[in-house]
């Protein structure tokens, strides 16, 4: 059995651990997570090990990115399983702060963004979300001082928001987006997939199949508006409550009218039962 990674839970212990890592020279990669790790997270860790000498994984279920009606209290917390997976992946350091460390009682500063953060996608349906994400990610970057940080492309708008924040604030962290890891039937891996009933799980791959079908039709020259309308209808007919099914510019997330408007990304968010799923695909 591989040795367990070093685990730190306070800022002073994190600083001491970072001094030891920096003393060995080389570069540091950070993989921010909320735990409940799956193969998608481990793909980030493997990519991090290829890009840096040392890898830090943070595990923190961030309360500020959840609205009161969302699933902060029930979000999966699987610490023992997470630790075993990170040991197997040969992670160097786990940063596992508690809420009072990240947000002391007198905490009063937030990072807010515009640009990709106001694209009327996740920001429209979860207006609290990106303020929480940018603040916690900014703090993690300041605390861990990584050279590179890795994020999954499943949360595509989040990836673009973090990339914009780093550029705007001169944080000096290279942001790497890692392709979505999927189940054999195409469902994007997500910690929230455990919420799905057997029946819902059987329907869930509809999102990816619809993305693939739409991308193929667009590449074949079909009219974008008709393709997107057909896709939205397919998703709703499968029993989903659709938040959005959108074609956007892959970099700016601005709306597009056709493939001629630049690299295009298709993005979808929908609920089946009480579980909200997101996915995306480049055209």
From Swiss-Prot:
Residues at the catalytic site: 41 (proton donor)
Gene Ontology molecular functions: ATP binding; pantoate-beta-alanine ligase activity
Leader peptide range in chain numbering: none
Compartment list: Cytoplasm
SUPFAM superfamilies xref list: Nucleotidylyl transferase (SSF52374)
Stored InterPro entries: Cyt_trans-like, Pantoate_ligase, Pantoate_ligase_C, Rossmann-like_a/b/a_fold
EC number, UniProt record: 6.3.2.1
Alphabetical GO biological process terms: pantothenate biosynthetic process
Enzymatic reactions: (R)-pantoate + beta-alanine + ATP = (R)-pantothenate + AMP + diphosphate + H(+)
Pathway: Cofactor biosynthesis; (R)-pantothenate biosynthesis; (R)-pantothenate from (R)-pantoate and beta-alanine: step 1/1
Binding site for (R)-pantoate: 65, 158
EC main group: ligase
Positions with a binding annotation for beta-alanine: 65
Top-rank taxon: Bacteria
Keywords from the named record: ATP-binding, Cytoplasm, Ligase, Nucleotide-binding, Pantothenate biosynthesis
Chain positions recorded as ATP binding sites: 34-41, 152-155, 181, 189-192
GO cellular component: cytosol
Quaternary structure annotation from Swiss-Prot or TrEMBL: Homodimer.
Other observations noted: The reaction proceeds by a bi uni uni bi ping pong mechanism.
Protein family (similarity comment): Belongs to the pantothenate synthetase family.
Function: Catalyzes the condensation of pantoate with beta-alanine in an ATP-dependent reaction via a pantoyl-adenylate intermediate.
Name of the protein in its database record: Pantothenate synthetase
